[in-house]
């Protein structure tokens, strides 16, 4: 008799637990259908009031680095030809660039091509002349090219309007030379001068589908 009573008691307790779970599921379903008009309290019942509104900021992911930026990214990047010989070191604001390429030039020297897109520093330099393959890089990124001087072939290439460019040899932008380095390793330009030229030419009016990279998530 005692064993039978225990089994009966166990069945009753099980039914009671199932009924409680079912009731909680029904209450949760009603709360969801109600559109979050009330928030369930831990102790039972509901707390009146609407759920808080969360505003998600407008962000954009750089196709060059995968970094997230608030607000809109520019229509196209800026590629700057940077000196890389001993007399030019240290260069200014290279850490602000999204990408930096190193290319060989004459005399066993190299030159840097800095790609700026997510952030633009106060000034750039020391700026040096261009070569045709620097222009090719700018075309790949649908960018704006900034340099001081050019080889004969690079001049012909740029003059054919393959990319928008700013060059100290034929621009109204104000380049300047710093006193702590010797020419030709001391040519600089301020970002406000570059931005003024970009705006006046309308180079940022049309968004470009620029070259992008794939990044691993997590």
Regions found by a protein language model. Give the residues of each.
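N-terminal Lys/Arg-rich, disordered targeting/topogenic segments
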Residues: 1-21
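Short, aromatic- and cysteine-enriched interfacial helices/patches
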Residues: 3, 18, 46-54
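Hydrophobic membrane-insertion alpha-helices, especially the h-region
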Residues: 24-37
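Hydrophobic single-pass membrane-insertion segments
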Residues: 35-51
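A surface/extracellular/periplasmic glyco- and lipid-processing/surface-interacting theme
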Residues: 49-101, 106-218
């Amino acid at each position: 008799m005692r064993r039978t009573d225990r089994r009966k008691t166990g069945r009753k307790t099980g039914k009671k637990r199932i009924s409680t779970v079912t009731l909680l599921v029904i209450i949760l379903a009603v709360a969801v259908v109600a559109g979050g008009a009330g928030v369930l309290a831990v102790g039972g019942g509901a707390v009146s009031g609407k759920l808080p509104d969360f505003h998600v900021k407008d962000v954009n992911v750089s196709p060059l680095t995968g970094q997230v930026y608030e607000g809109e990214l520019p229509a196209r990047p800026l590629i700057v030809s940077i000196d890389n010989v001993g007399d030019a070191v240290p260069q200014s604001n290279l850490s602000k660039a999204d990408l930096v390429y190193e290319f060989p030039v004459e005399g066993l020297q190299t030159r840097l091509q800095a790609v700026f897109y997510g952030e633009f520093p106060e000034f750039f330099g020391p700026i040096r002349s261009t070569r045709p393959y620097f222009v090719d890089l700018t075309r790949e990124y649908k960018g704006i090219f900034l340099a001081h001087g050019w080889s004969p072939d690079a001049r012909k290439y740029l003059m054919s309007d393959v990319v928008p460019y700013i060059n100290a040899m034929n621009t109204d932008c104000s380049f300047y030379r710093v006193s702590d380095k010797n020419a030709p390793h001391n040519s600089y330009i301020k970002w406000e001068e570059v931005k003024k030229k970009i705006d006046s030419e309308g180079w940022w009016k049309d968004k470009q589908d620029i070259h992008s990279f794939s990044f691993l998530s997590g």
